[in-house]
């Protein structure tokens, strides 16, 4: 990952052996009972209401299982919508608390979650460097996998038109260590 040895044909074992949890279920499991900072909490604005009705809205589900759930998003309209619908600890990046505050005491967040964010950012390394302003004990970054079966339609590319990048497990790790 640090570029000490070069290979133009290395095969990375992805560990895809046996049954696994759905990604959303695993994220809820990781957040259980923790103080979390959820970066990119708004999702795509047109999808929030629909996902909430279906019980699939990640930020809402995280807030149900976490001890504290602070949401951060660059979408000011989405932040306003969430605040008006029962999520008062939702902020734009400039207003977000850098630490978790519990009983008047500042503490590092237990978990900082970047779920489906990194693929939207023009400069992922710079963005991740900027995340250092927040205090957290653990960082979890998830993104759509470039290798997932839905992306391999014959003769076409299934895309989210807001994405700037596709990551593989290895290339995401390379960006994270930069």
Please name every model-derived segment:
Residues 113:
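A conserved beta-strand element that flanks and buttresses the S-adenosyl-L-methionine
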Residues 16-35, 45, 52-60:
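Conserved alpha-helix/loop element of class I SAM-dependent methyltransferases that forms part
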Residues 33, 108-109, 136:
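Local beta-strand N-terminus motif with an aromatic residue
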Residues 2-15, 20-21, 81, 122-178:
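S-adenosyl-L-methionine-dependent methyltransferase catalytic module, highlighting the catalytic core
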Residues 41-100:
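Class I SAM-dependent methyltransferase SAM/SAH-binding core
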Residues 28, 96-108:
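Short amphipathic alpha-helix with an adjacent loop that forms part of the alpha/beta core around
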Residues 116-120:
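A short His-aromatic
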Residues 35, 67-68, 138:
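Residues at the starts of beta-strands that form the adenosine-phosphate
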């Amino acid at each position: 990952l640090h570029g000490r040895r070069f290979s133009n044909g290395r095969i990375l074992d992805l560990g895809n052996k046996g049954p696994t949890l759905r990604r959303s279920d695993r994220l809820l499991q990781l957040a259980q009972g923790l103080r979390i900072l959820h970066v990119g909490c708004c999702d795509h604005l047109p999808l929030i209401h629909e996902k909430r009705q279906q019980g699939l809205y990640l930020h809402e589900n995280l807030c149900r299982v976490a001890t504290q759930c602070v949401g951060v998003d660059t979408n000011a309209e989405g932040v306003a919508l969430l605040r008006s619908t029962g999520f008062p600890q939702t902020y734009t990046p400039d207003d977000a608390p850098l630490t978790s505050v519990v009983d008047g005491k500042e503490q590092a967040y237990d978990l900082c979650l970047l779920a489906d964010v990194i693929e939207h950012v023009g400069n992922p390394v710079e963005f991740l460097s900027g995340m250092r302003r927040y205090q957290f004990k653990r960082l979890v970054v998830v993104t759509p996998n470039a290798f997932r079966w839905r992306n391999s339609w014959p003769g076409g590319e299934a895309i989210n038109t807001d994405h700037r990048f596709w990551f593989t497990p290895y290339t995401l790790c390379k960006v994270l260590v930069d």
